Amino acid sequence: GFAVEVVHRPGNGDWTSAVQEAIARPGAPVSLASISSVHWADGGAIDIASIAPALRAKGAALLVDATHGAGVTPIDVKTLDPDFLIFPTYKWVLGPYGRAFMYIAKRRQEGVPLEQTGFGRRAIASEAAPYLKDTNFAPTARRFDMGERDHFISLEMAAVGMEMLAEWGAGAISARLGVLTDRLAEGLASESL
């Protein structure tokens, strides 16, 4: 069995310390930590780079939900070394709904996918005979591909959005958002909200 532990919003707003305290707590070991790089409710940034080593020291897997950060904050999977990193394209990546991406570290690519598809198998192809030539899972992260992944219009839309972001740069986008947020904070400081 397993238990799900939720880290509740800390009174001081320091999500990183709250997550680190939860990891260090005595009790059942953490097996998998699913952590958003930017909290969805309050926009609080979570320093995944400082949390990852603590999880590795405990032998826990790290899944980074980059939904609210991909495209705005730089993410280097080589340095961060998460087991999994996921994000949809409909937020900051400027893509359509229904399209998402998942990075899977090589050490985790032998896992069993939740969705059992022909795309995730070694050799299942409607144009080939025999159709079910090799039903073993693909030896790479391709085994985790979704069914109906070849929706060409949404793939093109996602690609264009990512090309635009690559041209602008996550650092420049983040800096611009910082300027706008500071301006908003200054304007609201005089209001009685």
Set out the residue ranges of the language-model regions.
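Pyridoxal 5′-phosphate
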Residues: 1-193
